[in-house]
């Protein structure tokens, strides 16, 4: 059990579990909403124009809307839950706080750049050593990146700008703090990283080394969070890491 838990609201592993379940449920609900609207639209079009519905397959635009709505819904849940259940912890920088505050030393941002570089090099080496089969990369991210037009632009913006903000706040911020208020920092960091890896599974099933890549990134981001008592360096590192795969040749 952690001996550094600070006084504050009741916010521990149980609340972290509810936070995680709500996050997943909101994401699924946002996804389903997009597909329901698409299906209803197809049904109405079929009735109004008197043609058989057939077996339509949702395209990249539907997947893009599903991804966007899922992201928005899960981010809204995260914001509302923390505001209701753990607001006093928001700007506390210790392991038992959420860490939405600047680091105490500017060197934290230099460390963030180093973390992004190490994670990017590791990912590149894994790709060189165990090249992925493009035919097996059929996760949502891969499908959207191969689509033309706004679906590709949308997923790029979400991956580069949205994910570093929301995922750091969720995993290295709120969830880590909830666990660290009862458990040790190593255990909390390990569990947080495993959950982080698991939630990236849909895009990694076609290339198993991808799980190692995400795991290394998650572990490094936890180290940044604990060392500098702030989420902000991790957000920078996450942004740089994701950007490297979208904007570097």
Region spans (language model):
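N-terminal, membrane-interfacial amphipathic/helix-forming hydrophobic leader that caps
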Residues: 1-102, 106, 128-129, 243-249
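Generic preference for well-ordered secondary structure
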Residues: 9, 13, 52-56, 82, ...
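Alpha-helical transmembrane segments of multi-pass integral membrane proteins
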Residues: 21-30, 107-127, 158-163
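Alpha-helical membrane-spanning segments of integral membrane proteins, especially the hydrophobic core
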Residues: 64-67, 101-117, 144-155
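Transmembrane helix-loop-helix hairpins at the membrane interface
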Residues: 117-121, 129-249
């Amino acid at each position: 059990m952690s001996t550094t838990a600070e006084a504050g609201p009741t916010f521990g592993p149980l609340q972290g579990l509810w936070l995680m379940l709500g996050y997943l449920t909101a994401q699924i609900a946002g996804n389903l909403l997009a597909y329901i609207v698409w299906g209803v639209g197809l049904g109405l079009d079929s009735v109004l124009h008197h043609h058989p519905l057939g077996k339509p397959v949702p395209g990249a635009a539907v997947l893009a809307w599903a991804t966007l709505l899922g992201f928005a819904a899960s981010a809204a849940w995260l914001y509302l839950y923390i505001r209701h259940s753990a607001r006093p912890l928001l700007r506390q920088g210790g392991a038992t706080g959420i860490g939405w505050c600047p680091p105490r030393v500017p060197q934290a941002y230099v460390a963030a750049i180093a973390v992004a570089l190490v994670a990017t090099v590791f990912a590149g080496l894994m790709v060189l050593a165990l090249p992925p089969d493009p035919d097996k990369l059929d996760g949502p991210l891969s499908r959207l990146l191969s689509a033309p037009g706004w679906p590709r632009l949308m997923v790029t913006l979400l991956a580069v700008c949205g994910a570093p903000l929301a995922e750091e706040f969720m995993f290295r911020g709120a969830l880590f703090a909830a666990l660290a208020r009862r458990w040790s920092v190593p255990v909390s960091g390990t569990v947080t990283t495993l959950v982080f890896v698991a939630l990236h599974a849909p895009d990694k099933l076609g290339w198993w080394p991808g799980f190692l890549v995400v795991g290394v990134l998650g572990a490094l981001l936890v180290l940044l969070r604990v060392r500098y008592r702030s989420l902000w360096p991790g957000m920078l590192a996450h942004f740089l890491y994701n950007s490297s795969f979208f904007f570097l040749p």
